[in-house]
Structure formats: structure tokens, C-alpha cells
Amino acid sequence: MCPPVRQRPAQAPPAKRQALETVPHPQNRGRLMSPKARPPKMQRRPRPPVAKRRRFPRSPQQVERPILPPVESTPQDMEPGQVQSPPQITAVIQLRQERDTMRPPIYLPALLANCGPAGLLRAHRLPQPKPPCQSRQRPSPDSQTSPC
């Protein structure tokens, strides 16, 4: 059996129809229904957008502060009433500068150097790298293939 065909709703009785037609609602002229309590969505006043909640809030930016040059105070500049600044502060600054300049570059495994940060994600899936062979003699430096 076929589903029932939707029919138009029954028209209002003539007295109500006349009252509705006299009220100026051009959008309701076709359906002859009473005006809605809320206007349709496009005519409503838009609500200001709500601030979206973040599932993972943003981390605060980590600002690298510049390293101050060491303060060098000579005894002839100092007046007798002045107290000399503690020397450990300048020593810490000097140590930090030396540490930053004298430190060798950070060691990066070959996987990270070749594949970038994605290599770290793939590292657990790859087989362990073979240790270099100690038993055989050293290959000549111009040979391309390794003895392993």
C-alpha cells in the first residue's frame, strides 16, 4: 500500500479568514495561519558569538631572556661608602655564557637528523640499529659498503 498523500490543512472558517486577511502579515498570506510567537531564524536578532572552550588550552609562550653582560666594577670607581655587589652573580652570568658558547652542538640521532621530528614518532616501529662490527678488520675509507 502506498503511504497516505499529505493534504493541505483545512482552511479557517470564513469569519476567521476575513479577520486574518485584514491583518497585514504578507508572509502569512499564503498559509492563512496566525502569526508565530517567534519570528523565523533569519529575522531574529543574531546573538553575539560565544567564546569557544579549548580542550587543550594554549601553553604560555616561553620567552628566552637575554643574557646580561657581566658587570665589571673596578675598585677605583667605588666610593668608600658603597657596598660591592656580590661576586657570585657575575660568576653565574659568566658561567652561563661560557656554558652556552663552549657546549658542543646537541647530539641528534641519525633518525632524527634524517627524518626530522617525525622520526621520533616512527622510532618505536623500526628495528634496533646494528652495532658496528668489532671482529672484522677495518674497511678501507674509500669503500662504500659496510662489512656488516
From Swiss-Prot:
Residues 134-148 have a biased composition (Polar residues). The keyword Repeat does not apply. Residues 38-57 have a biased composition (Basic residues). Residues 1-17 have a biased composition (Low complexity). Residues 1-86, 122-148 are annotated as: Disordered. Keywords: Early protein. Belongs to the Epstein-Barr virus BLLF2 family. This is Uncharacterized protein BLLF2. It comes from Epstein-Barr virus (strain GD1) (HHV-4).
